[in-house]
Amino acid sequence: MVMKFKMSKNVICYTWLSVCLSSAIPAFAVQPTLKPSDISIPAISEESQLATKRATTRLTQSHYRKIKLDDDFSEKIFDRYIKNLDFNHNTFLQSDIDELRQKYGTKLDEQLNQGDLSAAFDIYDVMMKRRYERYTYALSLLDKEPDLNGQDQIEIDREKAAAPQTEADANKLWDARVKNDIINLKLKDKKWSEIKAKLTKRYNLAIRRLTQTKADDIVQIYLNAFAREIDPHTSYLSPRTAKSFNESINLSLEGIGTTLQSEDDEISIKSLVPGAPAERSKKLHPGDKIIGVGQATGDIEDVVGWRLEDLVEKIKGKKGTKVRLEIEPAKGGKSRIITLVRDKVRIEDQAAKLTFEKVSGKNIAVIKIPSFYIGLTEDVKKLLVKLENQKAEALIVDLRENGGGALTEAVALSGLFITDGPVVQVRDAYQRIRVHEDDDATQQYKGLLFVMINRYSASASEIFAAAMQDYRRGIIIGQNTFGKGTVQQSRSLNFIYDLDQSPLGVLQYTIQKFYRVNGGSTQLKGVAADINFPEIIDAKEYGEDKEDNALAWDKIPSASYMEVGNINYIDNAVNILNEKHLARIAKDPEFVALNEELKVRNERRDRKFLSLNYKMRKAENDKDDARRLKDLNERFKREGKKALKDIDDLPKDYEAPDFFLKEAEKIAADFVIFNSDQKINQANGLSEAKTESKK
């Protein structure tokens, strides 16, 4: 079967699942530095075929979600592979997809079982040639400065958009993309000559990256289309990626401590390592795009279109050296440059820390837990002794941004706050349920307890928070958690008898599911706060329930446990504390400013198009800067600091106050007062009862 499509200059090309380019490229003023013949698909290796076969066997036999690898599932893998290769649906034509689907749509199941990668490589080959064509067209648009005064718009999120029907449709999408790139640089006060040079280099670099494609890259993307179709936490790591991953979790690795992800030509921050320079800076956030990297001195290098591993190597470096990142914020606005000092990710930076704060005359303790590392419970035990010695009247366990860790530590930590009993239930792929219990019959801390959470609290954090909530042991404050209630394990695809076999990569796949002691899963729903804070992390953008194929929420029978807190007492306290909390933040200038910022964020999140009119975009950016400058200067005034004249004058080492924690401490102080009043009332009631009985 042949595929037919039109190209520029009305040239008609016929190809066997490929794209003809060589004679169809007109003579543009800005030319690509590479020819179509320079773009070639790497050869399929025997190792890749063996890795595919073994990965397929393990995923179909050992995954928690039992799947049937048939024609229907093959179609789903096909769709996800196309999506992985063309996330914004601006590279493939619909005719490409139709042709590829007809040939391979229902064949991937058989090929995977056989270790056959022909479909994966053929589809990737079409993508490479189409991408070359798109960037060649993008370069042609740099021939002259475009008109940025019209009413053109760019579609912000094309994840669910249809593929372009024709080359003309694809060109319209790239017209918009190039204009947007130009506007983003123009907003940084770049002249047209600078913009043209920068984008010429960027687009040619993206083409050059195509020539650097390795077979491992294709296999990893393809097998991840298969793995992620089963569930979002199942993945395949190529030998090179697995090696990098192992290095990244080695605490001696020197860098800034970020986990990055790549979509199309963009690299963004997926998560921040607790205690690492990026997290400590408070200036980087998941979703932020990295568009440039520079060292302590010299130019910032444009990294749009870079390979992920190349960018990682650029960011890593010796302890004490500086790296500069040019960031496009996830929440919008113009790019900014952030300077970080590379450092080792030290275990002491990830360790639990204890602080005290006097609030309304009450001594409030806070234990910040960045992760559930091995040895956490022993560390917290020591902190609880200090807490008792300092006569703390309430404790806040801060689990914000804590993505989890060791299950054993989540269970043991819970045991410090209850006498004994079940903490979490785990069900495996064979429906066997195991109850993890605290059985030491001792309770280290018996005082007033709060657990602080947010959208990035996940896994082990959710286990601890859920246990405290189900036992009525503590009050949960903050934002609904992430909702990751599954357990993964990593397995090398090399077998013990593979004596001379080169590395085949690693498979991470889901094997179990977590359940609360009340029987409900933490999966998808997470843990809801008893007292809610504003959604500073957008729940409509981040969370397990945003994944299109996450495992469903369900429940199993409740474990046998006894609530330690009085239901009516806790509910009454929550109602009173929440009322005070809402009244307070309604007047707090930090929360008022935050709510204004969140209103803008939510409005922009919901809009589907972005203007390509430079004056309109500049006016919006100027308005954003003016609003943020006003908020900063009002804060500085309250702090007795000198006002800023420009938002760019903000010191690089400036750290914003943690007013969420300050409010949590005020809630804790309210609870101390409430609890004291209740005891007085009970004592008075008992005294009155005794007096009445004597009469």
UniProtKB/Swiss-Prot annotation:
Transmembrane segments: none
Cellular compartment(s): Cell inner membrane
Listed GO CC annotations: outer membrane-bounded periplasmic space; plasma membrane
Molecular functions per Gene Ontology: endopeptidase activity; serine-type endopeptidase activity
Pfam family, any one: DUF3340
Coiled-coil intervals: none
Ranges where the PDZ domain occurs: 256-316
Gene Ontology biological process: proteolysis; signal transduction
Annotated active site: 459 (charge relay system), 470 (charge relay system), 484 (charge relay system)
Family per similarity comment: Belongs to the peptidase S41A family.
Primary role: Involved in the cleavage of a C-terminal peptide of 11 residues from the precursor form of penicillin-binding protein 3 (PBP3). May be involved in protection of the bacterium from thermal and osmotic stresses.
Protein name as catalogued: Tail-specific protease
Organism the protein comes from: Haemophilus influenzae (strain ATCC 51907 / DSM 11121 / KW20 / Rd)
Lineage: Bacteria, Pseudomonadati, Pseudomonadota, Gammaproteobacteria, Pasteurellales
UniProt gene name: prc
